[in-house]
Regions:
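Secondary-structure boundary elements
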Residues: 1-68
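Hydrophobic/aromatic-rich core segments of domains that either
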Residues: 41, 75-165
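Charge-rich, low-complexity amphipathic helices
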Residues: 44, 61-65, 69, 102-106, ...
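Hydrophobic/aromatic-rich structural module bridging two neighboring secondary-structure elements via a short loop
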Residues: 64-65, 72-78
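A structured, mid-to-C-terminal "fold-capping" secondary-structure block
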Residues: 136-204
Length: 204
């Protein structure tokens, strides 16, 4: 579980501004649930989703997401993890493979979100990508209310990762404009669906 509290180059929660915000958000909170809710709602509501705003600033490191107040779903998950880990709440990274037809026809890509370890409930998934018409992600454990319901040919990656996927980090660091990003969203091999089914079939 300690690996879900680690600081990394991307989850750089020793940054002074992240530390300050993490402390402010946890003020007067009595439980990890209260802290997690405040951190989640801050990132969801106060950091622009780069795709929704067609922002040409692509961020990756948590401190940059906070500095520029913008990020794709992946980057927003990096900031949320930093705020929670700074408050000693284990946090991991989760992904879905979704249709990205709102940006380009007939493409699929990874969507990034978080899993938070809550003392009362265990792992709980949240999606801080930002709400808009048709998207209403909430924090109400143990009920998970994510941004998107899975449709045909979409799936969850079953793992909870300690660090962001390398393909996600590489994409965010390489492509900097809105147009570059929508033409190069991070994705995985379709064979992943077969692995997912194998893992599911092997569950006790």
């Amino acid at each position: 579980m300690t690996k879900f509290l680690d600081e990394t180059n991307i989850i750089d929660y020793s940054n002074q501004e992240i530390q300050k915000l993490a402390m402010n958000l946890s003020t007067d909170c009595k439980t990890d649930i209260e802290i997690a809710k405040k951190c989640f709602e801050y990132v969801r509501d106060n950091i622009n989703h780069s795709g929704d705003y067609k922002d040409n600033t692509t961020t990756c490191k948590a401190s940059d997401v906070l500095k520029y107040k913008t990020g794709w779903c992946y980057a927003k998950s990096h900031l949320l993890a930093s705020l929670l880990r700074a408050n000693n709440i284990p946090t991991g990274f989760c992904y879905q493979r979704l249709s990205c037809s709102e940006y380009k026809d007939d493409i699929y890509c990874l969507h990034g979100l978080n899993a938070i370890y809550l003392k009362e409930y265990g792992w709980y998934k949240v999606d801080a990508r930002g709400n808009k018409e048709g998207v209403n992600a909430q924090f109400n454990p143990p009920i998970e209310k994510l941004a998107f319901e899975l449709e045909e040919n979409e799936f969850d990656l079953p793992e909870i990762y300690e660090e962001p996927l390398e393909v996600v980090v590489q994409t965010l660091e390489k492509y900097k404009t809105y147009e570059e990003m929508i033409n190069n969203f991070p994705d995985i091999e379709l064979a992943k669906t077969d692995n997912k089914n194998e893992e599911t079939n092997n569950l006790p």
